[in-house]
Regions:
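Conserved beta-alpha-beta core of the PfkB/ribokinase-like small-molecule kinase fold
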Residues: 133-185
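Short, hinge-like loop/turn segments at secondary-structure boundaries
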Residues: 23-24, 74-76, 99-101, 152, ...
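Residues at the starts of beta-strands that form the adenosine-phosphate
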Residues: 3, 54-56, 79, 161-162, ...
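Glycine-rich phosphate/adenosyl-contacting loop at the front of the ribokinase-like
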Residues: 1-58, 67
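Conserved N-terminal subdomain of the carbohydrate kinase-like
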Residues: 26, 50-132
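Short glycine-rich anion-binding loops that position phosphate/pyrophosphate groups of nucleotides
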Residues: 10-12, 88, 109-111, 139-142
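Cofactor-binding loop segments of dinucleotide-utilizing enzymes, especially the Rossmann-like FAD-
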Residues: 7-11, 60-63, 85, 98, ...
Length: 185
């Protein structure tokens, strides 16, 4: 069976809550938050695990939010490989407004990665067995260029990994230029 790995460069700890209504400048009383792991590749690994398969999620992790994210994935029995980062893992906020049924999604930028942190993530990728599937999904964090990502993809392909890219904009166009991608979304 093909081994599946995911790479998420901008993981998140997603929190969701509900409030009766939203209005400016007042205190908005909310329900107790619900926390879930987030980020493109992490969501892929969660789905594979939920369906009875096995996918290892590779991602950077920092601070208390990163620890909480890792604990939630452990609760779901999703295997992880992480690289400690200086910056805390981002936390997003989803708010459901009961009166209107509307949902507001506040998405923070991913934690910036240093060159060394990115290099350590790439080293983890390059230890994956040839023939394995690598799903790279999610947004790019500050400090990581499309060129950095495409070089990682090329190195992974040279290692014998089959790559799937789930991205948008410049990263998606660059993935098409790299070629030999199993699937692009």
């Amino acid at each position: 069976m093909t081994k599946i790995y995911t790479l998420t460069l901008a993981p998140s700890l997603d929190s969701a809550t509900q409030t009766p209504q939203i209005y400016p400048e007042g205190k908005l009383r909310c329900s107790a938050p619900v926390f879930e792991p987030g980020g493109g590749g992490i969501n892929v690994a969660r789905a594979v695990t939920f369906l009875g398969g096995k996918a290892t999620a590779i991602f950077p992790i920092g601070g208390a939010t990163g620890e909480h994210l890792a604990a939630l994935l452990a609760d779901e029995q999703v295997p992880i490989e992480t690289v400690e980062t200086r910056d805390w893992t981002r936390q997003n906020l989803h708010v459901h407004v009961a009166a209107s049924g509307e949902q507001y999604r506040f998405v923070m930028p991913g934690a910036a990665l240093t060159d060394d942190e990115f290099r350590r993530l790439e080293e983890k990728v390059l230890t994956i067995d040839p023939g394995s599937l690598l799903v790279i999904s999610g947004s790019l964090p500050p400090g990581i260029s499309v060129e950095n990502l495409m070089q990682l993809v090329k190195n992974a392909q040279q290692q014998g990994l089959r790559c799937i890219i789930d991205s948008s904009g410049d990263a998606l166009a660059a993935a098409l230029d790299v070629g030999n991608i199993e699937l692009v979304k």
